[in-house]
């Protein structure tokens, strides 16, 4: 699968916008992404290794909920990680 990073996440991946990861599930892909780009780990995952709710995941344009991270994914899937922005 290919992870596509944008916005403030780029600085944690040495400004690499796309990172290809070989993994059977999105959960495994996130773990391997954090191994490949260690500075992303504390940004994407909490102390228990769970995906932080401040971010949203989209696979091939469709939002994926946290409960779906263990579902099988294909090698050609494109995963976008978007940071939710709030303010006033």
Q: Can you annotate each of these PLM segments?
A:
Residues 1-87:
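Ubiquitin-like/PB1-type beta-grasp interaction modules and other compact soluble beta-rich domains
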């Amino acid at each position: 699968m290919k992870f596509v990073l944008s916005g403030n996440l780029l600085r944690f991946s040495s400004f690499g916008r796309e990172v290809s990861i070989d993994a059977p599930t999105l959960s495994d892909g996130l773990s391997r992404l954090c191994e490949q780009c260690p500075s992303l780990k504390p940004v994407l995952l909490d102390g228990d290794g769970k995906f932080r709710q401040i971010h949203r995941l989209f696979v091939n344009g469709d939002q994926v909920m946290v409960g779906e991270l263990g579902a099988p994914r294909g090698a050609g899937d494109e995963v976008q990680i978007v940071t939710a922005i709030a303010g006033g």
